[in-house]
Amino acid sequence: MKTLLLTLVVVTIVCLDLGYTLTCVTTKSIGGVTTEDCPAGQNVCFKRWHYVTPKNYDIIKGCAATCPKVDNNDPIRCCGTDKCND
């Protein structure tokens, strides 16, 4: 009986995948691209092309709770798997 109970606990933990954290590519470091484990509640990676001039833009990447709203008609792409915003 103890073996059955222990087996059920192990199977439950494996199936629930406790502690999963989304990993997104970020542009927080100056001139560099890194990855970041998103904080709890932030389950979306995003990539935004922020236009400075019509032919010049910055790419901003990171984690978010929801897909950020578009400002100034900047294109944005959101996704929900590890490093999908690369």
Swiss-Prot record:
The keyword Signal applies. Keywords: Disulfide bond, G-protein coupled acetylcholine receptor impairing toxin, G-protein coupled receptor impairing toxin, Neurotoxin, Postsynaptic neurotoxin, Secreted, Signal, Toxin. GO terms for molecular function: toxin activity. InterPro entries: Snake_3FTx, Snake_toxin-like_sf, Snake_toxin_con_site, Toxin_cobra-type. It is found in: Secreted. The keyword Secreted applies. Disulfide bonds join 24-45, 38-63, 67-78, 79-84. One of its GO terms (cellular component) is extracellular region. Residues 1-21 form the signal peptide. Expressed by the venom gland. Negative results: has no effect on M2 (CHRM2) and M4 (CHRM4) receptors. Monomer. Binds irreversibly to M1 (CHRM1) muscarinic acetylcholine receptors, and reveals a slightly weaker effect on M3 (CHRM3) receptors. The mechanism of toxin-receptor interaction comprises at least two steps. The first step is fast with no competition between the toxin and the antagonist. The second step is slow with formation of a more stable toxin-receptor complex and inhibition of the antagonist binding. Belongs to the three-finger toxin family. Short-chain subfamily. Aminergic toxin sub-subfamily. This is Muscarinic toxin 2. It comes from Dendroaspis angusticeps. The lineage of its organism: Eukaryota, Metazoa, Chordata, Craniata, Vertebrata.
